[in-house]
């Protein structure tokens, strides 16, 4: 079963990724306390299996916090997920696209930006559709389009 394994909040642009065990989310805004609010990139998500696969050629699996995503989920393949819904507990997130790796990846680990340049290698981003709370251990499912609300 897929689950939410990590949550990180970025309190300011280019700031550290602070781990938390749960977070409140607001429809149309994102994670409460996170620097990215509103728009289509309210939440960024990476899959642990994908992270392990793309970083394997680097010789060691770096801490996924270096990806600078808000959420780490297990057993989810984001390839062709644009427009689908990611359900985390009772909260839905509409996936709008893939997150592209930036120069911060290369600064963190030499070769990481290139390793992440494969399709969907940087994970996904999306918009929160429901107010609620998410917590490490919540069940996760990627499902087809079920409308916006």
Residue ranges and their predicted role:
Residues 1-149:
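Metal-cofactor-dependent catalytic cores
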């Amino acid at each position: 079963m897929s689950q939410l394994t990590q949550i990180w909040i970025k309190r300011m642009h280019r700031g550290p990724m602070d781990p938390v065990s749960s977070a409140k989310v607001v429809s149309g805004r994102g994670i409460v306390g996170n620097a990215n609010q509103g728009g289509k990139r309210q939440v960024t998500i990476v899959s642990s299996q994908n992270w392990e696969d793309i970083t394997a050629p680097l010789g060691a699996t770096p801490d996924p916090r270096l990806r600078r995503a808000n959420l780490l989920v297990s057993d989810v393949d984001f390839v062709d997920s644009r427009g689908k819904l990611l359900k985390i507990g009772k909260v839905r997130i509409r996936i709008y696209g893939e997150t592209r790796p930036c120069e911060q990846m290369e600064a963190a680990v030499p070769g990481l930006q290139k390793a992440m340049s494969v399709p969907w290698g940087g994970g996904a981003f999306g918009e929160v559709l429901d107010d609620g709370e998410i917590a490490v251990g919540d069940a996760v499912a990627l499902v087809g389009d079920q409308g916006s609300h």
